[in-house]
Amino acid sequence: MRLTSQVLSDAPTIINPEKQVTLSLRSLKIPYLENLGITKDTYEVIDLTDNELIELSNFPRLKNLKVLLVGNNNITGINDDKLPNNLPHLQSISFIHNNISKFSDVRILCRFKNLSNITFIENPITDSPNYRYFIVWLIPTLKVLDFSKVKQKELVKAKELFGESIDDPSELALSMLEDISTTESRKNQISSKDIRNLQDVGKKLTDEDKAKLLQELETADSVEDIERIERALHNGHM
């Protein structure tokens, strides 16, 4: 389904427990983003969970947007150099259950000045050696990665491995930013989110548990609930 002006007008608006105005665009099979300018920068949260997005791009300038939920899509990276300027106050992104496999495809995240919370759980990129250290180094404003707080010792280790900053990278950092997939993702590139859901979630949960969690995810109306359910799916227990 295309993200038409009519679809946007008909989409439900939710006030979540954090008192944030949320635009719910879940489970609409949206293949790419368009027409978001008609929202007139009304929303603090945009929920695009469970669609068919391949890349994160084509956002207009939305100064009020703080949280972006794009879990359970087919996103392989961010292909929009204007995104950091267009979303200047973005604080949190959930990429859970996508197809991101190359650090070069998320390098632009270092330019988000207020990004403090990000999730890459169930993406091929997490199989890379030193993944957590690298993301912590790449995004110096980060406070929480994959539901775990960033520790001071991680920041120290990250600089030892990759250099003082993205402006002064080590050879290891440069090699990880090359346009190549991680070893694991080259062997096992996953293109279907349905296959990912069956393989990654089904093997950890009973059918009854899985059905219950997915039903809860469909009706969740707050960032807190969404993260709780996604964490349960990732950990394999209720």
Curated annotation (Swiss-Prot):
Start and end residues of each LRRCT domain: 123-161
UniProt feature coiled coil, ranges: none
GO molecular function terms listed in the Swiss-Prot or TrEMBL record: U2 snRNA binding
Name of the protein described by the UniProt record: U2 small nuclear ribonucleoprotein A'
Annotated keywords: Leucine-rich repeat, mRNA processing, mRNA splicing, Nucleus, Repeat, Spliceosome
Localization annotation: Nucleus
Family affiliation: Belongs to the U2 small nuclear ribonucleoprotein A family.
Repeat positions for LRR: 19-40, 42-63, 64-84, 89-110
GO cellular component: post-mRNA release spliceosomal complex; U2 snRNP
Keyword Nucleus: yes
Keyword ATP-binding: no
An annotated GO BP: mRNA splicing, via spliceosome
Self-association state and partner proteins as the record states: Associated with the spliceosome.
Domain of life according to the entry: Eukaryota
Function comment: Involved in pre-mRNA splicing.
Gene3D superfamilies cross-referenced by the UniProt entry: Ribonuclease Inhibitor (3.80.10.10)
Taxonomic classification: Eukaryota, Fungi, Dikarya, Ascomycota, Saccharomycotina
